[in-house]
C-alpha cells in the first residue's frame, strides 16, 4: 500500500469518513444527548472512536476487495485511523464537556456532589498511556517497513544517503503529526480547566468579601465536581 498515490488513498479515506459522518448526527441525538450530562462526554468519545474505526474498516475492506491488497498491508491504515480517531474522539468529548459546563453555569441550580468519581489523574494516565502506545506502534510499523525497503536497495553511497534522508523525513513527519494532535488536545482541555477554575475563583473572591450567597455549579464528575459540591 506504500506505493499507492496519496491522492488515491486520500479519496478512499474521504469517502469512508463521509459515509460514517452522515450517520453521526442521528447517532449523537440517540446515543449521547439522550443520556444525563455526566455520561454524555464518555458516550461522545465512544461514539466518535467507533465511527472512526468503522471508517478505517471500510477503507481497509475496499483496499482488500477492489485493489487486492493483503490484510497485512492494510494493517497500518487501520492503526492510523485508530490513532486519529482516538485523538478526535477525545477532542469531541472535551467539547461536549465544555458545552455541559456552560449549560451548568447558566442554570445555577442546586446539585448534590457526584457520588461516582471519575478521577482526573486516571483520565490523564489512560490518555497518556494510549498516546504512547499508538506512537510506539506506528514507529515500529514504519521502521519495519523501512528496514525491508533498505535491504533491497543498491548498496552505493548515494543510494544509502538518499534512503537515510527519506527515513528521517518520514519519522519527522510522524512526530509532527503526533505533536499537532497532542497540542490540540492540550488546548482543548485547557479551555475546560479555565472555565472551571475561573468559576471557582470568582465564587471564592465573593466569599472573601463576605458574600456567602455564591454557589459553584457542579459541571463535572471529577475532583472539580467534588470541590464545587462542597463549596
Q: What does each model-found stretch correspond to?
A:
Residues 147-172:
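Membrane-interface helix-start motif
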Residues 31-46, 97-133:
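Positive-inside N-terminal membrane-insertion signal
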Residues 127, 139, 178-194:
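Cytosolic-side ends of inner-membrane transmembrane helices, especially those
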Residues 191-206, 211-231:
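HAMP signal relay modules and closely related sensory coiled-coil linkers
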Residues 1, 58-71, 146-149:
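Juxtamembrane "helix-exit" motif on the non-cytosolic side of transmembrane helices
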Residues 2-16, 71-91:
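Alpha-helical transmembrane segments
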Residues 163-187:
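Cytoplasm-proximal transmembrane signaling helix
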Residues 19-35, 91-106, 186-205:
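Cytoplasmic juxtamembrane amphipathic helix immediately C-terminal to a transmembrane segment
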Amino acid at each position: 500500500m506504500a506505493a499507492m498515490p496519496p491522492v488515491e488513498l486520500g479519496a478512499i479515506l474521504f469517502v469512508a469518513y463521509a459515509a460514517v459522518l452522515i450517520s453521526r448526527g442521528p447517532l449523537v441525538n440517540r446515543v449521547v444527548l439522550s443520556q444525563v450530562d455526566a455520561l454524555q462526554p464518555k458516550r461522545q468519545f465512544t461514539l466518535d472512536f467507533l465511527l472512526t474505526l468503522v471508517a478505517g474498516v471500510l477503507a481497509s475492506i475496499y483496499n482488500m476487495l477492489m485493489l487486492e491488497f493483503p490484510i497485512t498491508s492494510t494493517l497500518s491504515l487501520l492503526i492510523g485511523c485508530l490513532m486519529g480517531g482516538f485523538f478526535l474522539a477525545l477532542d469531541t468529548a472535551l467539547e461536549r464537556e465544555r458545552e455541559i459546563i456552560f449549560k451548568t453555569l447558566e442554570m445555577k441550580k442546586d446539585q448534590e456532589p457526584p457520588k461516582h468519581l471519575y478521577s482526573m489523574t486516571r483520565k490523564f494516565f489512560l490518555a497518556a498511556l494510549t498516546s504512547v502506545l499508538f506512537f510506539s506502534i506506528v514507529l515500529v510499523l514504519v521502521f519495519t517497513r523501512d528496514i525491508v525497503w533498505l535491504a533491497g536497495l543498491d548498496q552505493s553511497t548515494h543510494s544509502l544517503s538518499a534512503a537515510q534522508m527519506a527515513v528521517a523525513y518520514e519519522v519527522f513527519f510522524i512526530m509532527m503529526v503526533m505533536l499537532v494532535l497532542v497540542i490540540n488536545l492540550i488546548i482543548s482541555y485547557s479551555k475546560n480547566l479555565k472555565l472551571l477554575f475561573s468559576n471557582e475563583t470568582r465564587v471564592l473572591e465573593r466569599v472573601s468579601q463576605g458574600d456567602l450567597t455564591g454557589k459553584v455549579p457542579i459541571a463535572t464528575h471529577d475532583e472539580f465536581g467534588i470541590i464545587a459540591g462542597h463549596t
